[in-house]
Amino acid sequence: MKTLLIHAKHFEYEAREKALDAAESIDGNRSGSFENALVVFVTVEKGDGSSQDVVEEAAADVLDVFRRVGASRVVVYPYAHLSDDLADPEEAKRVLSQLAERISSAGVPVSRAPFGWYKRFSVECYGHPLSELSRTIKPGRRVRPGYADFAVMFPDGRIVGIEELRAEELPEDFVALLEAEVFKKKREGGEPKYLEYCRKFGFEWEPMSDLGHMRYGPEATIMLDAVAEYAWQCARSLGIPVYKVRGTNTFNLSFKPVAQHAQLFGDRLYQMEVDEKKLILRYAACHQQFAMVKDWEISYRDLPFGAFEVADSYRLEQPGELLLCFRLRKFYMPDLHVFCKDLAEAMEVSFRIHSKIYEEIRKLGRDYVSIYNLTRSFLEQHRDYLKRLVEMEGKPVLLHFVPEGKYYWVINVEYNIIDELGRPREIGTFQIDVGNAERFGITYVDENNTRRYPVIIHTAIIGSLERYVFAVLDTAAKKARAGEVPSLPLWLSPVQVRVIPHSSEYLKLADSIADKLEEQGIRVDVDDREESLAKRIRDAEVKWIPYVVVVGKREAESGKLTVRVRGQGQYEMSLEELVGRLVSELKGYPRVSAALPRYVSARPRYSP
């Protein structure tokens, strides 16, 4: 049996004509209209009638959901479209009748729509986390309803089962996370607007490579360089020594630690054979950093410390899952591993990482909803630690329980934004790894001159470079949807200031302004094209250039510049005031060179 349970604010149906010769008699039951009803769409499958367990299990499940959602009645609605393995009509009618009777015997009002009729129906779903559920119940197999692998932890330390949740105490974004991760609800499709913005800045698929591989045009490369530098800056801000390293992306499976670590990622690894050697492309920076750090002589006095690399990473994602700037087969991961003396030190360091991850997403005007993947034993032994993490978030988190000993980590936190289309998208992450130090032979010498295995934190504070860009562009898409002007942060904009002279007569003045701005590390260009002023201003707006400076006779005589600030308006200010404003806005962010010709007229035409 397959069931689809909808908690409906309003539900109505009307039987129109017979679909089967064995259709039930109407007998005044041609239509029905109900408020606050739990509507149970039921497909009876072959063999359901041979086992009373099926009816008992289905009824128990319906009654459980009925009580939790606070419905006023149950409507059993025959629905043949949830399975291809249909019971014969007589068996189906018998099972449906038994199901309704079993629910009714529990004192619950039940209505049953007629079997074997074409029916019109309309439903208005409440839309809370328990309002759309589906079940599969097989003969001879008792299936306990519920979601035993999940729970929710609140900032006050309460842990609540999924079935006990109340929608009114949950933030909207968290409900979206529950619907996707627990109830597997699919959001409506459609092309997200951020893809248009990807094309605008030169983030594209490379058609001459494998699926899932990108290319980055000049503007996209400036943005990616800025994000890479910023990721390094974030890593260094944690208050511990961090060493930047580099290495290879190819590892030999004949080495036991490489092979063991590779097994954790299954069929998502790129593999190749060269000179009769089986090689893999790295999944992240783990292989290289661990292979390197195992050769270091480490004292307990050196801990904690980090190793950092922006690693070209390779994951053989399914073709249907690929999404530009988000789910890729090749991407850049600013991977930080923090080596700690023990689990206690790792948990203490993780608070800094947790705080930094939230600080960075909030700089974009966004917030996360989190999934804590962990074992039940870790929950029981470290409940206070988890409570502190959740308190720092200030909102509930989803706990996902995994089998003991299956993974190299004891906790894996996934930080999700809810995108423009209402879907969770993981950006940042951290894990506490208790297995890889021993696997790779990484040790340190403790206070008693004993060699020990460190505990390792894996983290990508701002996510992969591409996913951070995704978060920025999705934020712009949300702004556009809200009727605001979409924009990039100033530090990330490929061109931060464009100077537009009224005519060639003022090109020298435009150049002198650009010189002053470049001295401050500001990316500036000059639109010297023989186009109308209006067209050049419009082109700057199309390219989302944050500051546009127009210079002509008035500006030359007055010493005041006419400055258009994207999304804010037009201002008059001196060059010194403009520089001061830009320097202030860029404080704390990296300065990356423009790598573009100053004159717009000197550039070839390409998509951005």
Swiss-Prot record:
What is the role of this chain?
Answer: Catalyzes the attachment of threonine to tRNA(Thr) in a two-step reaction: L-threonine is first activated by ATP to form Thr-AMP and then transferred to the acceptor end of tRNA(Thr). Also edits incorrectly charged L-seryl-tRNA(Thr).
The domain-related comment in the record is: The N-terminal domain is an archaea-specific tRNA-editing domain that hydrolyzes incorrectly charged L-seryl-tRNA(Thr). Catalysis of tRNA editing is performed by the charged tRNA itself.
Q: Residue ranges of region Catalytic?
A: 192-489, 193-489
- Entries under SUPFAM superfamilies matching the protein: Class II aaRS ABD-related (SSF52954), Class II aaRS and biotin synthetases (SSF55681)
Domain of life, per lineage: Archaea
The record's note on quaternary structure and interaction partners says: Homodimer.
Annotated stretches, region: Editing domain = 1-145
Please share the entry's free-text remark on the cofactor.
Binds 1 zinc ion per subunit.
Q: Where in the cell is it found?
A: Cytoplasm
Protein name per Swiss-Prot or TrEMBL: Threonine--tRNA ligase
Report the principal subcellular site: cytoplasm
Keywords on record: Aminoacyl-tRNA synthetase, ATP-binding, Cytoplasm, Ligase, Metal-binding, Nucleotide-binding, Protein biosynthesis, RNA-binding, tRNA-binding, Zinc
Q: What GO MF annotations does this protein's record show?
A: ATP binding; threonine-tRNA ligase activity; tRNA binding; zinc ion binding
What gene does the UniProt entry assign to this protein?
Answer: thrS
Q: Which cofactor does it need?
A: Zn(2+)
Q: Which residues bind Zn(2+)?
A: C286, H337, H458
Catalyses which reaction(s): tRNA(Thr) + L-threonine + ATP = L-threonyl-tRNA(Thr) + AMP + diphosphate + H(+)
UniProt organism field: Thermofilum pendens (strain DSM 2475 / Hrk 5)
